[in-house]
Amino acid sequence: MDQLNNREQQEFQQLVEQKQMKDFMRLYSSLVQRCFTDCVNDFTSKALSSREESCLEKCSEKFLKHSERVGQRFQEQNAALMQKR
């Protein structure tokens, strides 16, 4: 990265930020789709039932913890790979 000029560094940073936003939106979309499908069953009311709300809270918490754990493992493996070089 030190070999890039200022403009190239800015372009690179912008690409990284765009990728991060895209990844975040993909994660959020997956979370919404999965938890909605698993938890929301009653369409006779505008409001969620207490059971559905509880399910959604647990589902989203579990999904985010899983995603965080996968990210940590990826970082650990990446660090181990970099040490081998």
From Swiss-Prot:
Alphabetized SUPFAM superfamilies for the sequence: Tim10-like
Compartment(s) where it occurs, according to its Swiss-Prot or TrEMBL record: Mitochondrion inner membrane
Membrane-protein topology: Peripheral membrane protein
UniProt-listed GO biological process terms: protein insertion into mitochondrial inner membrane
Motif segment (Twin CX3C motif): 35-59
A Pfam match: zf-Tim10_DDP
Superkingdom to which the source organism belongs: Eukaryota
An example molecular function term from Gene Ontology annotations: unfolded protein binding
Alphabetized Gene3D superfamilies for the sequence: Mitochondrial import inner membrane translocase subunit tim13 like domains
GO cellular component: mitochondrial intermembrane space protein transporter complex; TIM22 mitochondrial import inner membrane insertion complex
SS bond list: C35-C59, C39-C55
Task of the protein: Mitochondrial intermembrane chaperone that participates in the import and insertion of multi-pass transmembrane proteins into the mitochondrial inner membrane. Also required for the transfer of beta-barrel precursors from the TOM complex to the sorting and assembly machinery (SAM complex) of the outer membrane. Acts as a chaperone-like protein that protects the hydrophobic precursors from aggregation and guide them through the mitochondrial intermembrane space.
Subunit note: Heterohexamer; composed of 3 copies of TIM9 and 3 copies of TIM10, named soluble 70 kDa complex. Associates with the TIM22 complex, whose core is composed of TIM22 and TIM54. Interacts with the transmembrane regions of multi-pass transmembrane proteins in transit.
Matching PANTHER family: MITOCHONDRIAL IMPORT INNER MEMBRANE TRANSLOCASE SUBUNIT TIM9B
Protein family per UniProt: Belongs to the small Tim family.
Protein name, as recorded: Mitochondrial import inner membrane translocase subunit TIM9
Top-level taxonomy: Eukaryota, Fungi, Dikarya, Ascomycota, Saccharomycotina
